[in-house]
A protein has these predicted regions:
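Peripheral, non-AAA+ core regions of ATP-driven protein-machinery
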Residues: 1-216, 220-226, 329, 469, ...
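Short beta-strand elements
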Residues: 18-24, 281, 385-388
């Protein structure tokens, strides 16, 4: 006897339809699985056998062969437990129903309960794309399954409940796809109103948020670098539905989606510790999973104490932060994960932290500050659009009772600047100034003659690279957008050059 049912496979971030085929033949009882299953898939034999028996059904006393097609792609994880069980029951005649337009996925417990799995959102999207009219998913994954419209999504708690539904003895209600609404910022999101002083740093971060620029903050301990960084998500533009969907897919694949959350609507803020491994930062592992840089997609990746990160971890980010994706090459396959992030780095100017402090004396031996700062390579520094000094806050600023400008007011200006960018970049597939390539930079960031002269003098004096030249133009364009100006003029270029001053002050002295 032969039967087959549909499922969906997950390969990195890519999904594909899978046909689960079951064949019963004469011979000594055994249960074989073919189609490049990994260990977790092979182990499903025992889970399926026990789930069938504990659901009051009979496991066939014959030779059972299950094939997962296509057979040239390795199958990973326990997501095929449920479709394998359905295929076997159909092959034995214990389940008689039409499942041709249906897809199944889910892990089984030995008792017959259906457990949640990773990656349900992209797999439901693939099922819709493949033309399936129904998909049966674990009840635990109900929230993310509800995001997709155009396909009936049925949440399943147990094998018994699913079989009763398929036999039309009982009904499982499909989940209702919810409409996307932009969310207001959660009340517990840190606000810039809490930050005393640091007006120059706040202005630089406003420019960075408006244009999606990468930032380096350098200053002594306690000056507020981490405090400022944690408040950046509160001034970034609200996520669009497409951005929320992309981000949620990554969290779904990584198994990091919070319980009962259907969509991630607030921009991620990821702050890995400096002891993170290169694989933890970039992604990978035996079963490849997205790393911190991908989990920060459409949000902020904050690297505090940058020189303390391993050289490999730092250098691994150079290409991804420019390309907006990271590629992990393995012998068996190559995986790509999106990572369009706003990279924010912070560091002390020396090991003790007080090099250049106005009142505290640096206790490092001669040459230590330069050696410490040289841990950050020039090519990585070159990819950071904005460098800002965060000096210590004086007593008068700390003790004032006046409230600082709230994040909502800053976000309003950022939104207006982004709207100008979107209108200017319409049709290019780019959403902010920082993502422009060299050709678009020349087209949209042309300075006035006086501004061009200023930029030329700075280029020669600071010994800037071609990449730094383009970044100054893009930052100047963002400053002009914040001012509502059509042309990039002298004040805009002057402020943008100011944000490259760390090249000269610390790294080149």
């Amino acid at each position: 006897m032969f039967a087959s049912v549909n499922s969906v496979g997950l390969f990195g971030m890519e999904t594909y339809p899978v046909r689960v085929e079951a064949d019963l033949s004469a011979g000594l009882p055994r249960f074989d699985m073919v189609g490049l299953p990994d260990a977790a898939v092979s182990e499903s034999r025992e889970r399926v056998r026990a789930a069938i028996r504990n659901s009051g059904l009979d496991f066939p006393v014959s030779r059972v062969t299950v094939n997962l097609a296509p057979a040239d792609i390795r199958k990973e994880g326990p997501i095929y437990d449920l479709p394998v069980l359905i295929a076997i029951l159909k092959a034995t005649g214990q389940l008689k129903c039409d499942t041709e337009g249906c897809a199944f996925l889910g892990e089984l417990s030995l008792s017959g309960r259906v457990r949640g799995v990773h990656g349900v959102l992209p797999m439901v999207m693939e099922a819709k794309k493949s033309g399936f009219r129904e998909i049966y998913i674990p009840y635990e994954n109900l929230a993310e399954g509800a995001v997709v419209k155009g396909i009936d999504v049925y949440p399943v708690k147990t094998v018994d409940a699913l079989l009763r539904h398929l036999r039309k003895e009982e009904t499982i209600a499909p989940v209702s796809a919810s409409d996307y609404t932009e969310t207001t910022l959660p009340p517990d999101l840190p606000d810039f109103a809490d930050v005393k002083g640091q007006q120059e740093a706040k202005r630089a971060l406003e420019v960075a948020a408006a244009g999606g620029h990468n930032v380096m903050m350098i200053g002594p301990p306690g000056s507020g670098k981490s405090m400022l960084a944690k408040r950046i998500p509160s001034i970034l533009p609200d996520m669009t539905f497409e951005e929320a969907l992309e981000t949620t897919k990554i969290y779904s694949v990584a198994g990091a989606l919070p319980k009962n959350v259907s969509l991630i609507k607030v921009r991620p803020f990821r702050a890995p510790h400096h002891t993170v491994s290169p694989a933890g930062l970039s992604g990978g592992g035996t079963v490849p999973r997205p790393g911190e840089i991908s989990l920060a997609h459409n949000g902020v990746l904050f690297l505090d104490e940058l020189p303390e990160f391993s050289r490999t971890a730092m250098e691994i980010m150079r290409q991804p932060i420019e390309d907006g994706k990271i590629t992990i090459a393995r012998v068996a396959a190559t995986f790509s994960y999106p990572c369009s992030v706003m990279l924010v780095c912070a560091m002390n100017p020396c090991p003790c932290g007080f090099y250049g402090h106005p009142t505290r004396k640096c206790t490092c031996p001669p040459g230590a500050p330069q050696r410490y700062l040289s841990r950050v390579s020039g090519p990585l520094l070159d990819r950071l659009d904005i460098h800002i000094e965060v000096p210590p806050v004086d007593f008068d600023e700390l003790s004032t009772s006046e409230k600082a400008e709230p994040s909502a007011a800053i976000q309003a200006r950022v939104n207006r600047a982004r709207e100008r960018q979107l209108a200017r970049l319409k049709g290019t597939g780019i959403t902010c100034n920082a993502k422009m390539d060299a050709a678009l930079t020349r087209e949209f960031c042309t300075p006035t003659p006086a501004a061009a002269t200023l930029l030329k003098n700075a280029f020669e004096k600071l010994g800037l690279s071609a990449r730094a030249y383009d970044k100054i133009l893009r930052v100047a364009r963002t400053i002009a957008d914040l001012d509502g100006a059509e042309q990039v003029d002298v004040p805009h270029v002057a402020e943008a050059i100011q944000y490259r001053s760390l090249d000269r002050k610390f790294w080149l002295e």
